[in-house]
Amino acid sequence: SEMCIRDSPHGKKWCDGGRENFSQRNKRTDMYIPIIRYADVLLIFAEAENEANGPTAAAYDAVNQLRVRAGLDNLSGLSKETFRQAIQKEWTLETTHERIYRFNLVRWGTYLTVMKEYFQKNFPEKVKNVTEERLYFPCPEHDSLINPNL
């Protein structure tokens, strides 16, 4: 998988400049770099904690760290369902343009509903493409050969 590298010093840290395919004009690398941000860890924790135990102080603390950083008020006193919705909103806001929204919707079980509504409103001719058959990606062939039970 390729990762496009920007010209900023922050982006260059992900680049292996010694690779043959790297040049000033083509700032790409074939390195696969899994990235997990602290915000992801906080949201994963808050979501899991809320599902297991409801909105605990620890779950609120995790979400509120992100909200304070963004200049927003702390959350408190929410029901489990309302806190779940708040966490989902934080995921959406925190990961905008990171191409993981689809995966979150699938995990939350809301992908088909949300996407059908979106396509019906914006591209009604394409709503027929939002189907359960297209919900999950196929298992990679290599993995299927190793484990035929997939």
Model-derived features with residue positions:
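Extended, hydrophobic/aromatic-rich amphipathic alpha-helical segments that build helical scaffolds
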Residues: 33-65, 84-96
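Intrinsically disordered, low-complexity segments enriched in glycine/proline and serine/threonine
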Residues: 5, 15-16, 50, 135-136, ...
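Flexible, polar/acidic helix-loop-strand segments at domain edges
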Residues: 1, 6-37
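Short, contiguous acidic/charged loop-to-helix segments that flank catalytic cores in large enzymes
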Residues: 23-35, 51-55, 72-79
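Long, intrinsically disordered, low-complexity segments
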Residues: 28, 32-33, 67, 76-150
